[in-house]
């Protein structure tokens, strides 16, 4: 006779496997509980714990740095970098909020709506920074820059793909957007801005906004990867060689577009403390990481020595995400209105 304990384990495992086999992330679920994908709610908590608004930061010294301290060549790099960041931030705020329309499950909605709110905060922050740096007029014309326009086109293509009624094609667009836009596209610009503070001790307020933004974008990208892995588990036949080649092709195209942005940013000269070649390898590494997160092989060769010189960035951005979800900063102030210095915050 089989012991009752073993039988209980057997039937419990059978039940769980049956439930897993019948999961469908695209199938509407009316009831809130029980959760089918409870692990996803950690991303909602992560954004809540990272909550910030731009009025928390003091930019008085940044204005002085931008107008007086830095060279004209550096000012041009900063200006273009900020314009490139802001252009993306004003275009992506609807993506996450629409996720629930195609995956009508409570966990997806909770995370998606939380992410959408964070994108609005990002947009507000960079709109304010453009005003502070006197770049509002230039922002009106930034879409005329060929490199920026090229990125707008492939971003629009990804977003347009989310309107597809075909679940497989929709999955492709979610993958491309979350892993190549959210997880890569802005990060070379984040690296540039934060390096000014690290190497020259300037632009402290802006650097803190960029760091806060990049931590949240990292969470967005990781959530996207987890969604793709769930879909892959539920629909393995979608991820055939043709589908993977399509992703690889899009990845190469996205890399070329990002290189075009860098060429524009550095057209008047490079930074001595952050060579353009180093940033190229930084971007390649992030693309590789995105592919590996969904079980695909990396496609770019990277120079590990060049990556070592910027590993401080990954430590800053990802060092706390697995543990305390951004309990790095103080909360003993009025978040809605009080402007504080970097020493107060960190």
Please tell me what each predicted stretch does.
Residues 1-7:
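Intrinsically disordered, low-complexity segments enriched in serine/proline and basic residues
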Residues 21-346:
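Non-heme di-metal
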């Amino acid at each position: 006779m089989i012991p009752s304990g073993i039988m209980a384990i057997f039937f419990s495992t059978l039940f769980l496997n049956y439930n897993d086999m019948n999961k469908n992330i695209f199938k509407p679920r009316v009831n809130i509980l029980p959760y089918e994908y409870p692990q996803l709610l950690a991303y909602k908590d992560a954004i809540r714990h990272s909550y910030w608004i731009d009025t928390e930061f003091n930019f008085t010294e940044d204005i002085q740095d931008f107008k007086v301290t830095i060279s004209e060549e550096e000012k041009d790099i900063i200006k273009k970098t900020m314009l490139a960041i802001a252009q993306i931030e004003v275009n992506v705020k609807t993506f996450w909020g629409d996720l629930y329309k195609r995956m009508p499950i409570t966990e997806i909605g909770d995370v998606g709506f939380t992410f959408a709110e964070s994108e609005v905060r990002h947009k507000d922050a960079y709109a304010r920074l453009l005003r502070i740096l006197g770049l509002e007029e230039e922002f009106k014309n930034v879409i005329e820059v060929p490199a920026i326009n090229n990125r707008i086109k492939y971003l629009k293509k990804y977003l347009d793909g989310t309107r597809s009624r075909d679940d497989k094609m929709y999955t492709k667009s979610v993958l491309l957007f979350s892993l190549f836009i959210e997880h890569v596209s802005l990060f070379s610009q984040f690296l540039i801005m934060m390096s000014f503070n690290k190497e020259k001790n300037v632009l402290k307020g802006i650097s803190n906004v960029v760091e806060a933004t990049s931590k949240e974008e990292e969470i967005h990208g990781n959530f996207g990867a987890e969604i793709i892995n769930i879909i892959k588990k539920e629909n393995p036949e979608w991820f055939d060689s043709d589908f993977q080649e399509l992703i690889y092709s899009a990845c190469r195209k996205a890399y070329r577009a990002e290189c075009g942005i860098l060429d524009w940013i550095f057209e008047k000269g490079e930074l001595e403390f952050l060579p353009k070649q180093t940033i190229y390898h930084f971007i390649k590494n992030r693309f590789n990481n995105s592919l590996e997160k969904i079980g695909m092989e990396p496609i770019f060769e990277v120079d590990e020595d060049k990556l070592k010189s910027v590993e401080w960035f990954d430590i800053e951005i990802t060092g706390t995400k697995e543990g305390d979800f951004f309990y790095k900063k103080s909360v003993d102030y009025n978040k809605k209105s009080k402007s504080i210095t970097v020493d107060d915050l960190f």
